[in-house]
A protein has these predicted regions:
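Boundary at the C-terminal end of the N-terminal hydrophobic targeting segment
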Residues: 20-22
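Positively charged n-region of N-terminal signal peptides that target proteins for export
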Residues: 1-4
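Bacterial N-terminal signal peptides
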Residues: 6-17
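Transit-peptide-like, low-complexity N-terminal presequences
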Residues: 168-170
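Non-catalytic, conserved peripheral segments adjacent to functional cores
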Residues: 24-133, 142-143, 149-150, 160-163, ...
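Extracellular beta-helix/beta-solenoid repeat scaffolds
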Residues: 136-138
Length: 201
């Protein structure tokens, strides 16, 4: 009897393990991440990195530099363990990020007056994390997913709406010199990492 049924037992075990009936937490997280990317139609964002999904713009308008723009534009944005950094960029509009799921994320803000901030975008408010980060217009910023996180899905609202002519991606040596040493984490090496592939010689 043992010889007859052993192959059947082995076959059933293999079927069960391959069917996803007993998925590990890591497998469930990876599946959830893929589901969000698919359902929300997120696409890899060139230069800045991460995944972006356009939601829309508000019907209200405001005039900026002589052009009518929507008061606000809204997007989904995601970082993953394979695309963990939103590389340094400057935005003219104000930008607000709201954590929907996952994280936490380190949020680095560089103000035009030379001040710097590091805010942890996350749900553990008892540890100082914040589920919303609001960045004034005219700042540089970069985001980095925590190493123990698989992904972070965020909503972001830009006011007035985002347009490609009001963003600058990357910086160079003069920018690094300007902000290096403004905080313990703001080393030249780390700032260079946050600029990433968009280094301007």
């Amino acid at each position: 009897m043992k010889i007859i049924y052993a192959p059947c037992v082995l076959f059933c075990v293999l079927l069960t393990s391959g069917s996803g009936a007993a998925q590990s937490p890591a497998a469930r997280t990876a599946e959830r991440m893929r589901e969000l990317i698919r359902v929300l139609d997120l696409k890899v964002l060139p230069k800045e990195s991460g995944y972006l999904g356009i939601v829309g713009v508000s019907p209200q308008k405001v005039v900026v530099h002589g052009k009518p723009l929507a008061v606000q534009s809204q997007n989904y944005y995601m970082l993953t363990d394979t695309l963990p950094i939103n590389y340094l960029h400057w935005l003219e509009p104000a930008d607000t990020h709201i954590l929907i799921e996952g994280g936490p994320v380190d949020y680095f803000i560089f103000h035009p007056d030379g001040q710097v901030e590091k805010i942890v975008l996350g749900m553990n408010v008892a540890k100082g994390e914040r589920p919303i980060v609001a960045v004034p217009g005219g700042c540089w910023k970069a985001l980095q997913l925590h190493k123990d996180a698989r992904y972070a899905l965020m909503a972001n609202a830009l006011s007035p709406e985002f347009t490609p002519d009001r963003v600058r991606i990357g910086e160079g040596a003069a920018w690094v010199k300007r902000f290096a040493g403004k905080a313990e984490w703001a080393t030249p090496e780390f700032l260079r990492v946050m600029i990433g592939p968009n280094w301007k010689p």
